[in-house]
């Protein structure tokens, strides 16, 4: 389980980083 958590965390962070520019763009458009 300990070996899987870091990998999942990295994947989650990558997904979050991909979503951040979208939120910034939506905020700028609003």
UniProtKB/Swiss-Prot annotation:
It comes from the Eukaryota. Keywords: Cytolysis, Dermonecrotic toxin, Disulfide bond, Hemolysis, Lipid degradation, Lipid metabolism, Lyase, Magnesium, Metal-binding, Secreted, Toxin. Binds 1 Mg(2+) ion per subunit. GO terms for cellular component: extracellular region. GO terms for molecular function: lyase activity; metal ion binding; phosphoric diester hydrolase activity; toxin activity. GO terms for biological process: killing of cells of another organism; lipid catabolic process. InterPro entries: PLC-like_Pdiesterase_TIM-brl. It is an enzyme of class 4 (lyase). Contains 1 disulfide bond. Its main location: secreted. Its EC number is 4.6.1.-. Expressed by the venom gland. It is found in: Secreted. The active site is at 12. Its cofactor is Mg(2+). It catalyses: an N-(acyl)-sphingosylphosphocholine = an N-(acyl)-sphingosyl-1,3-cyclic phosphate + choline; an N-(acyl)-sphingosylphosphoethanolamine = an N-(acyl)-sphingosyl-1,3-cyclic phosphate + ethanolamine; a 1-acyl-sn-glycero-3-phosphocholine = a 1-acyl-sn-glycero-2,3-cyclic phosphate + choline; a 1-acyl-sn-glycero-3-phosphoethanolamine = a 1-acyl-sn-glycero-2,3-cyclic phosphate + ethanolamine. Belongs to the arthropod phospholipase D family. Class I subfamily. Dermonecrotic toxins cleave the phosphodiester linkage between the phosphate and headgroup of certain phospholipids (sphingolipid and lysolipid substrates), forming an alcohol (often choline) and a cyclic phosphate. This toxin acts on sphingomyelin (SM). It may also act on ceramide phosphoethanolamine (CPE), lysophosphatidylcholine (LPC) and lysophosphatidylethanolamine (LPE), but not on lysophosphatidylserine (LPS), and lysophosphatidylglycerol (LPG). It acts by transphosphatidylation, releasing exclusively cyclic phosphate products as second products. This is Dermonecrotic toxin LlSicTox-alphaIII-1. It comes from Loxosceles laeta (South American recluse spider).
